[in-house]
């Protein structure tokens, strides 16, 4: 069992001038800090393939960010900002393909200026989008044309940049804040470790490594701060993961795994738990934040993949969609990942806790070195390659 942790032990001083508000002009020209067995090496990201073990398989999260930020004005011309934070229903159906109306969970800025029964709207040519509050942060959007919710968001929405960038999105963010391999619509934040990859770099890696694309649709938990004194009580929002048998076979055949980003890591560690749950006859395969504390975790990686493959064949499933709320804290026993490619994260965040779980106290040395050597931080910042300690 993971004991209570003091969040203050996962703090560091991050000055505003360290936060990269804009990306590098060339994606792979960012700095790369390699951390292996406590040793730190300055590199460039375009050389990352030379630093990953030759027998490693590399897993990328291909979820695509949608224009989830919408700005309306009420009757008094006051700005109301709405961030759509849930794009799936309880059966994992993607709501982006709804037509005429959709009910979604949101975060609302300036909500006190929006009367409960007031419908606010905006128009674009002959399309009118209306929205009204329901309850529990849910709203109903309706529109007058036979278009999908995705099409409506592309017309009216903006790319949801993280609040710590403290700027409005620009047209170029529509490209810069997506990975070049993004495919499956459904995230409200980018899997930013992947932003450094160019087409030529991926082509080069494809010749030297087994690479595969998995899906975890990123939700509000990515930038939701930890506000509880007891870290264990932090509410981890669930996120939808999607995978097929090919993904499982590739994991099965991998003796060494590199996760591109914390979301890929959370996907991979969640997949292991699904196999363990099937083995232990769980009926509900959704993953609670500390499920790993309740399980025997006795299966090997290969045995876990076999359990899921057999389950999919038995139930004639080509794809599985599930929710994960896995919360990785220091003391966690990693079952899947050997290396992690990741940016530099916000102090006292769930992502810092994950890094500390993966490389132990070396995270402090890593961040101290990065600050001293003028690394750029957060979503548009530089990157690191971490070897499990």
State where each predicted segment sits:
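Surface-exposed, charge/polar-rich loops and edge strands
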Residues: 1-389
